[in-house]
Amino acid sequence: YGGDPQKAETAGILHDIMKDTDPQEQLRVMTEAGIALSEVEQSSHKLWHAISGAAFVRTQLGITDEDILNAIRYHTTGRAGMSVLERIVFIADFTSAEREFDGADKLKKLVEKDLREAILAGLTFTIRDLAGRGKTIHPDAIAAYNDMLLHG
């Protein structure tokens, strides 16, 4: 997809660095980094590992490359204006081998053909799934969907 392989490897290895960390520790890392969570973020602990992960990688590992940090930060929600690296990490996480959901195989095949269409399909699935279960939808996911639809 034209991304930097070294950055992709780094972001790929580190994107879930805080996933198995206790939520209170994640909150501490975010607080110490000066991150104020939105109301939607406060209500969805599943998003915390991405936010705290980017903060941890910056403060504890000393990685300051904004593209890598943003790929980690937005790998769960996406966002408008995603870089190639952000797109790669987002869809790689979404289609990883352990992910099982209705349509997973179709999406995994689509990513081999068209990154944009795969991201749109992933975002569509996420938005429908969350809305169908009465869960909040992060504004960044909606912005990512609209941006991909309008600008590719």
Regions found by a protein language model. Give the residues of each.
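Charged phosphate-binding loop/patch that engages nucleotide di/tri-phosphates or the phosphate backbone
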Residues: 128-152
